[in-house]
């Protein structure tokens, strides 16, 4: 059995409700035991909560993606009106405390995705750092693991997490250097998220005991499905690639990565 530790199946910008149901069924037929829907804004996190609240073995996290840390984006100012991506600390805490009554009524199992993204000049770095610290404070307060989004910002990332030695988590979709992979492995207890990007790149591969499998669906579709929308069922293809890459039986890959996800997220 497999766990997809990072996807966005709840996001109706990419999936209709009917498509999401079909993809859930497809995933289950391909041995995906559980999936985790990752929030990227206040509003999106609430959508993830609602989706998990009505589906068995679906979990959610509360997060604000670094690109949503400011109302300034590459395309200019955000639309006028309420800013769910910039919800205040009280709203964030309330989202963690208050779970709607439903079939499964699940609480969040983590904070994320949160972090730093310096790839685009249009994203305010100071705003990202401020929000990142606020989200880490939430994770500390509620004793929740963190799904980290870090791109071209590892110096600041390592500097900030020094102030949070109790934080545990996973570096989602690691795409950086061997040097920074070594720092993560040696200086933190964080896991590394391995997804479809690894199947067509030359990225360094972490040891199995530090790997979580993820799809990031609908993004980062693995070989041999590149060019079509990604879905949770394709995590099996990532596991098969990893088995070949590491020279380890697929059954062991499934067992160990599932054990890692259960240990981190408590599911």
Where do the language-model regions lie?
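Mid-domain alpha/beta scaffold segments of enzyme catalytic cores
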Residues: 1-267
């Amino acid at each position: 059995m497999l766990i997809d530790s990072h996807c966005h199946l709840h996001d109706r910008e990419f999936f209709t409700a009917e498509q999401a149901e079909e993809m859930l069924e497809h995933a289950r037929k391909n041995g995906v035991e559980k999936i985790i829907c990752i929030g990227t804004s206040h509003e999106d996190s609430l959508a993830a909560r609602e989706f998990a609240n009505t589906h068995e073995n679906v979990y959610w996290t509360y997060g604000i993606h670094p690109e949503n840390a400011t109302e300034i984006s590459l395309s200019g100012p955000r639309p006028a009106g309420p800013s769910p991506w910039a919800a205040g600390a009280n709203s964030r805490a309330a989202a963690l405390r208050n779970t709607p009554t439903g079939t499964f009524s699940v609480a969040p199992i983590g904070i994320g995705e949160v972090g730093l993204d310096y790839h685009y000049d249009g994203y305010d770095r100071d705003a990202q750092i401020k929000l990142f610290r606020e989200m880490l404070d939430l994770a500390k307060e509620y004793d929740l693991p963190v799904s980290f989004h870090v791109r071209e910002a590892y110096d600041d990332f390592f500097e900030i997490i020094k102030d949070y030695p109790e934080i545990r988590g996973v570096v989602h979709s690691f795409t950086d250097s061997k040097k920074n992979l070594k720092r993560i492995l040696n200086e933190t207890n964080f896991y590394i998220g391995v997804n479809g990007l690894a199947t067509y790149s030359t990225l360094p591969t972490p040891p199995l005991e530090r790997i979580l499998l993820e799809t990031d669906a609908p993004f980062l579709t693995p070989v041999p499905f590149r060019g079509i929308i990604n879905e949770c069922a394709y995590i099996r293809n990532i596991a098969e690639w990893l088995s070949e890459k590491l020279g380890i039986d697929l059954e062991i890959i499934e067992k160990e990565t599932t054990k890692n996800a259960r240990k981190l997220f408590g599911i």
